[in-house]
Regions:
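An alpha-helix initiation/capping motif
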Residues: 137-149
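Mid-to-C-terminal "cap/lid" subdomains and adjacent gly/pro-rich loops that border
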Residues: 1-66, 121-126, 144, 153, ...
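C-terminal structured subdomain/cap of oxidoreductase catalytic cores
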Residues: 1-2, 41, 70-128, 148-234
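Short acidic alpha-helical/loop segments enriched in Asp/Glu that coordinate divalent cations
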Residues: 128-140
């Protein structure tokens, strides 16, 4: 049983109501029930790909009635492509111009192709393969251009952007090791933007750890100021 039947408006709405009223039912699932991390070989020090097992078939083949289905997707963890974030105007209320420049580095295409290829090998294992009706064969595309086209048309973000306010000691670093913005008093940045590069995994837990550390730094700073003020008092 999967969430595929509940992607429609009626069944999805009923499942949502059941969850809100009773805290039970299909909507208690967050959709991605399993995952895996792996590298190019067993000696890899860091994973290069992450797989997500999604308990729903979001885009079933046309003209096919599918009662249940699941999907497994691969994610490249260390892309080399770099995007930009620029001011759109001098108006502080104006939204910034964000260009992620996905797949602008050739090596990302190579990594994505290999990630899909290795994921198919995992799917072919006896414990899982018997449940899979259809999978993508990246080698069935006869040219590099066709493989690139297929990847570009289907690739999506998983919303782990980092690095726009990176920490460091060089002149291009935005914050120092105390999370303080260089050149501006009493301003810290505490989120994923301070990471110099994206990590090989999900960003939520590291950001929570950063926030806890930042709270300690701010509290320590307040205590120091309180002591200094106290010394000045008669």
């Amino acid at each position: 049983v999967t969430l595929t039947p509940y992607l429609g408006l009626i069944k999805g709405g009923l499942a949502g109501a059941q969850y809100l009223l009773r805290g039970t039912g299909p909507a208690t699932s967050q959709g991605v029930e399993a995952g895996a991390f792996w590298g190019p070989d067993k000696n890899s020090s860091l994973p290069e790909w992450q797989a997500h097992l999604i308990v729903a078939l979001r885009n079933p083949p046309p003209n096919e009635r599918i009662a249940h289905g699941f999907a497994i997707r691969v994610c490249q963890l260390q892309p080399k492509s770099r995007g930009t974030l620029r001011l759109r105007s001098a108006d502080p209320s104006d939204t910034p111009a964000i260009d992620p420049r996905f797949l602008s580095d050739e090596s990302d295409f190579i990594s994505m192709q290999e990630g899909v290829r290795q994921l198919c090998e995992i799917i072919d294992q006896p414990g899982l393969g018997k449940f899979v009706k259809r999978k993508i064969d990246i080698d069935a595309f006869t040219s590099v251009a066709s493989r690139k086209k297929w990847i570009r048309e289907r690739a999506e973000t998983i919303y782990h952007p980092v690095g726009t306010c990176r920490m460091g000691e060089d002149s291009n670093a935005v914050v120092d090791d105390q999370l303080r913005v260089r050149g501006i008093d009493n301003l810290r940045v505490i989120d994923g933007s301070i990471m110099p590069t994206v990590i090989s995994g999900n960003t939520n837990l590291p950001i929570m750890a950063m926030a806890e550390k930042a709270a300690e730094l701010i509290a320590e700073g307040n205590e120091t100021r309180a002591v200094l003020v106290g010394r000045r008092c008669p």
